[in-house]
């Protein structure tokens, strides 16, 4: 239903005409009929609101959601208000009846499911007792007489009947559960983004290729690893050979111990000393020997 109703806005503008539309239990209003495509200025859900009729004015009515919304509306005449009251009341009643039916169905299925579950527990206890009885018959003490075939047949028939009843009750529980929890509830129309498969980014693909290489890449990598390892092994063998050669020639001294080594201040500072040259060292040794020869003459 749709039509014009006056809505109380504020004390400055007072009652203003608005275009109201009642659809699927929701009452929405617009500035005019032409503004329906632009979107509503407000709405109220009939299932949760209260309809109140003004006691003095036969054209006024109120829609109230306690603590949330309060619509003051006025029709053109009493007949128009009555027409709106019937439409609003019918919409509210239909929604309420639908809700109560669903609640009744849910409560009834819950109670029946509880009853069947209690029956299953009872049959489970009976099964355990009957299985225990048959075990006692089978593992009977040798000192006593063996159980009769009649007792065994009776116990097995009771066990078979209890099993059949248990299975039947279990099937009824499954039917009740399927009626209560419909398949639509288990269909995920909007899958969770954390669970839904997402195409990996290029960076993730690179990481995956590095951390989890395929068979071909593993063969290549193993081959590339073997090559440097073999190269290192060859180098180490060569070094061992050179070390063994140097050890065999270790009788030859690396430095001549008779050669005098003169360390001057310059050599301590990191400069090359001139005394390290063989000719200059010989001259220095010659001068030193001459000075030693002249010392006895002075002493004498």
UniProtKB/Swiss-Prot annotation:
<keyword id="KW-0333">Golgi apparatus</keyword>
<comment type="subunit">
    <text>Interacts with GTP-bound ARF1. Interacts with SACM1L and VAPA and/or VAPB to form a ternary complex.</text>
</comment>
<dbReference type="GO" id="GO:0042802">
    <property type="term" value="F:identical protein binding"/>
</dbReference>
<feature type="modified residue" description="Phosphoserine">
    <location>
        <position position="236"/>
    </location>
</feature>
<dbReference type="InterPro" id="IPR001849">
    <property type="entry name" value="PH_domain"/>
</dbReference>
<keyword id="KW-0597">Phosphoprotein</keyword>
<protein>
    <recommendedName>
        <fullName>Pleckstrin homology domain-containing family A member 3</fullName>
    </recommendedName>
</protein>
<dbReference type="InterPro" id="IPR045188">
    <property type="entry name" value="Boi1/Boi2-like"/>
</dbReference>
<dbReference type="GO" id="GO:0055037">
    <property type="term" value="C:recycling endosome"/>
</dbReference>
<feature type="compositionally biased region" description="Basic and acidic residues">
    <location>
        <begin position="279"/>
        <end position="290"/>
    </location>
</feature>
<dbReference type="GO" id="GO:0000139">
    <property type="term" value="C:Golgi membrane"/>
</dbReference>
<comment type="function">
    <text>Plays a role in regulation of vesicular cargo transport from the trans-Golgi network (TGN) to the plasma membrane. Regulates Golgi phosphatidylinositol 4-phosphate (PtdIns(4)P) levels and activates the PtdIns(4)P phosphatase activity of SACM1L when it binds PtdIns(4)P in 'trans' configuration. Binds preferentially to PtdIns(4)P. Negatively regulates APOB secretion from hepatocytes.</text>
</comment>
<keyword id="KW-0472">Membrane</keyword>
<dbReference type="GO" id="GO:0005769">
    <property type="term" value="C:early endosome"/>
</dbReference>
<dbReference type="Pfam" id="PF00169">
    <property type="entry name" value="PH"/>
</dbReference>
<feature type="region of interest" description="Interaction with SACM1L">
    <location>
        <begin position="1"/>
        <end position="100"/>
    </location>
</feature>
<dbReference type="GO" id="GO:0042147">
    <property type="term" value="P:retrograde transport, endosome to Golgi"/>
</dbReference>
<dbReference type="GO" id="GO:0005794">
    <property type="term" value="C:Golgi apparatus"/>
</dbReference>
<feature type="modified residue" description="Phosphoserine">
    <location>
        <position position="244"/>
    </location>
</feature>
<dbReference type="GO" id="GO:0005802">
    <property type="term" value="C:trans-Golgi network"/>
</dbReference>
<dbReference type="GO" id="GO:0070273">
    <property type="term" value="F:phosphatidylinositol-4-phosphate binding"/>
</dbReference>
<feature type="region of interest" description="Disordered">
    <location>
        <begin position="197"/>
        <end position="300"/>
    </location>
</feature>
<keyword id="KW-0446">Lipid-binding</keyword>
<dbReference type="GO" id="GO:0005829">
    <property type="term" value="C:cytosol"/>
</dbReference>
<feature type="region of interest" description="Interaction with VAPA and VAPB">
    <location>
        <begin position="97"/>
        <end position="300"/>
    </location>
</feature>
<dbReference type="GO" id="GO:0007032">
    <property type="term" value="P:endosome organization"/>
</dbReference>
<dbReference type="InterPro" id="IPR011993">
    <property type="entry name" value="PH-like_dom_sf"/>
</dbReference>
<feature type="domain" description="PH">
    <location>
        <begin position="1"/>
        <end position="93"/>
    </location>
</feature>
<dbReference type="GO" id="GO:0001881">
    <property type="term" value="P:receptor recycling"/>
</dbReference>
